Structure formats: structure tokens, C-alpha cells
Amino acid sequence: MTTRKRNEFLDIASEDEDGSDRGYDSEAAEESKGRFTKRRRTHTRADDLSDEESDLDVSDEDDERDSKAKIKTKSKRKTAKHGDEIATDDSSADEDDLQEDQYLDASAQPGSPSHTDSHTTTTTTTTSKPQKKKPLAKVKPPKKNKTGVVYLSSLPPYLKPFALKSMLETRGFEPITKVFLTPEVPSAAGPRRRSNKRKTYADGWVEFASKKTAKICAETLNASIVGGRKGGWYHDDVWNMKYLRGFKWADLMEQVQRERSEREARRRIEDTRARKEDKVFLEGVEHGKVLQGIQKKNEEKRRRQAEARADAEAAVAATAATSDAGNGPQGVKVRRLFKQNEVKVGRDKIKGDATLEDDTKRVLSKIF
């Protein structure tokens, strides 16, 4: 038997190293198992044929040549098929082949030419084949938003959102993705209807999946009656529609959020103002109550003083009346006179301008 100069199984191993970066694939693994079993069957069959050749050589030399020619042609075909199968096998079959090659080449010495040739061929094949790069996955561009928005400036009374959507879809304007209706705020001056709990909406927005559908809907239904069943609730109401060019649902939600935040801010300011006014009012009420209590106490004090003064005057008048009643007839007042005694003044307290008596003057004239 001639030794092989090129090891085909090692070449397949290098190809497997190139494809090892692709990861695990369950389908490829199942196919490789089937190919491995098929190849093992072909190996055993080739071995049996080689044994038959040796038996024929011993028995009959003439028949050996003919049988060898036939067997060689068959073996060439089988080896060609076998080589094609080897080129398509995966990593699991190649590892087994490498083990078999090592067993077959073990008889060859390291210094033999067959060994050196096989070694050089394997090194050249492993270094010559470049690695295949994976194609990059194509990034799909984001889908454009092709929706259209229609604005309804007025709506029929008590019309609900799902009823509006069904009315538009029955007329062929679909698909409708979103509907938003603004609830009507009742005026403070108007009468309050407590019995009717149905909601009314002031205006609304409808988003269609296609701009074309939105434009056709606005152009077709604008300034036309709602129609439908003749005795229906909304038969005679008129559509008021307008297609908003370049307007998206995100803009509407942003506007709604901004209006809601502004409304909440105004409500907070009004609440704080009302609380301050209530606080001032309560303080004024408390202060007024205190002043009323003080005034009430002062009035009671004045009233008590006036009553005491009146009682005293009445008592004085009563005593005077009783005293006057016993003195004169019929209560006539009598005038009484009292004699006053002259006050005696001492000698040392005589004034200088007082006149002296005649006796005293005579005595004094004699002395002085």
C-alpha cells in the first residue's frame, strides 16, 4: 500500500475552525450526526472489501487481477463519494477522523518523507485559508409616522367616544387608532341639571392610521348632517371637521398636558387665595366678637351706674319730702333765723387800725 502525501482530514479540521465562530445550531448538529453514521458504514464496507482482496490473492492469481481491476474502479467511485461527504461534514465527524488519521500515521516514522510531506501540507492549508467574516445585519430604518389627525370643533350632545368611532367606521373611514374628546365644563350661570347624568363633550380629535383617509374623511363629512336612521338621536346634527396638516398625536397630548398643568396651577393659586381670604375673614370675625363683648360689658357697666345714681337721687328726694311734710301746714317750707355770737378777739390780736377807748388813751398819755 502506498502512503498518502496529503492528509484530507486535517484540511477539514481547519475549515471547521473557521466556521466555529457561528455558534451553536441545532439543525446543523442533527445533520452532522446522520452523516457521521453513514460515513462509519462506508468505512466498514471498505475494510471488508480489502479483506476480500487479500483472500483472492492467496487463492487464485488469475482471478485476482480481474477482481482487483473491478474492485479498484468501485473503490475509486466510493472514495470520490467519500471525499465529497468528508468536505461537507461538521466538527463532530472531523474530530473522529483526526483520531483515525493519527492511528494510521502512527506506523510512519517522524523522519520519513511521508510524515514530513503530510506535516507541510497541513501547515500550508491551515495558514493559506483566510477566515470568513460574518455579514453585518442590516439595520432597518424606523418606520415613519404616517397617521393623520382630524379635529371636530363641535359634537352632537351626549355623543360617546365609541359611538363616534363606530359612526365613522361604518362610513368606510378606517382604521381609527385613537379618539380623544374634551368634556364640556358647565357654566356657573346656567341651571344645574341634577337628574341627567349623561356627559356632553365640547370638541374632539380623531387619529386615523393613514393621512389619506383622514383628508378624505374631513373633506367628505365636513358641513354635512350626521344622517343615519331617520328617527335617530343624531340625525340632524352637522359635522364640523378639519384635517390638521403636520399635526401629530404627540403634539395633542403635549398640549393637553400643558393645559392640564396650567389649570392645576390656576386652581392651586385660587385655593391659596381662598384660604388666605378665609383666614382673614375668620380673624375679623373673632376680632369683631371680642369688640362686641367689650362693648356689651361697658354698656352693662354704664347701665348699672345709671341705675345706682337714679336710686340715690330717689332716696334723697324721699328723705327731703318726709322731713318737709312735718314742719308746715300742707308741706309749706318755713324760714328759720339763727343769731350768731360775736367772736372775742384777744389783746395781742387787736389790729393797729382799731380805735382805742378814752380811758386807755388818757392813761397812756400820762405815761408817755
Swiss-Prot record:
Transmembrane segments: none annotated. One of its GO terms (cellular component) is nucleolus. GO terms for biological process: endonucleolytic cleavage in 5'-ETS of tricistronic rRNA transcript (SSU-rRNA, 5.8S rRNA, LSU-rRNA); endonucleolytic cleavage in ITS1 to separate SSU-rRNA from 5.8S rRNA and LSU-rRNA from tricistronic rRNA transcript (SSU-rRNA, 5.8S rRNA, LSU-rRNA); endonucleolytic cleavage to generate mature 5'-end of SSU-rRNA from (SSU-rRNA, 5.8S rRNA, LSU-rRNA); small-subunit processome assembly. Keywords: Nucleus, Ribosome biogenesis, RNA-binding, rRNA processing. InterPro entries: ABT1/Esf2, ABT1/ESF2_RRM, Nucleotide-bd_a/b_plait_sf, RBD_domain_sf. Gene3D superfamilies: 3.30.70.330. It is found in: Nucleus, Nucleolus. Involved in the small subunit (SSU) processome assembly and function, and in the 18S rRNA synthesis. Required for the early cleavages at sites A0, A1 and A2. This is Pre-rRNA-processing protein esf2. It comes from Aspergillus clavatus (strain ATCC 1007 / CBS 513.65 / DSM 816 / NCTC 3887 / NRRL 1 / QM 1276 / 107).
